[in-house]
Amino acid sequence: MNYNQTLEFLFSSLVSYQEKGPEAYKPGLERITAFCKHLGNPQRNYFTIHVAGTNGKGSVSHMLASVLQQAGYRTGLYTSPHLRDFRERILVDGEMIPKQKVVNFVDKHYDCMKELGLSFFEMSTALAFDYFDQSDVEVAVIETGLGGRLDATNLIIPIVSVITNIGLDHMALLGDTLPKIAAEKAGIIKKSIPVVIGEKSD
């Protein structure tokens, strides 16, 4: 398959939030944990910064990646969703993952993805982890997809966690009050790992 055929295949065979909405949400780390073990746990081979929040997490992630790159670090950036091209989600030093890398990853691991029942986001996350490792990234900025505690990205052990703000969003999935939503996003906080909070409410 070529790149476009691969994407069409993935969108038609793996459940995606963009296509199905809330029914595509598959909380839990069991599937991504098993798949990353299958890959050799590539996410353990470089430093990571984890970013969550209701608003601003994409902008903060891009700014952090830019600063790190300018400081001389080989930098990965994983965000979602994309605007025009799926590859916008996965950048190394500002360059999108090559199309052939996406095709090769799917060709090699699709049977395992289907067996585990991965969602499209879980596949994308694992692809990013693997590509960053292959690209000898020194530090990767990883943006959560939805929430934090049960988000597929929460497999990482970051050097710092960032929570930009908390608002009433995805209430059907994360909870119907700010404290409930905050608890989900605070799930990216790890013991003995620094946390930066971007906004405080009175």
What are these regions (language model features)?
Residues 159-160, 172-202:
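Internal gly/pro-rich beta-alpha loop/helix module
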Residues 154-165:
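Inter-motif core of Ras-like GTPase G domains
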Residues 49, 76-78, 160-162, 196:
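Hydrophobic/aromatic beta-strand patches that form the interior of the parallel beta-sheet core
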Residues 22-29, 33-44, 70-156, 172-175, ...:
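ATP-dependent carboxylate-amine ligase catalytic core
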Residues 79-81, 143-146, 165-166, 184-185, ...:
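Fold-independent oxyanion-binding glycine-rich loops
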Residues 1-53, 60, 66-71:
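Short functional linear segments
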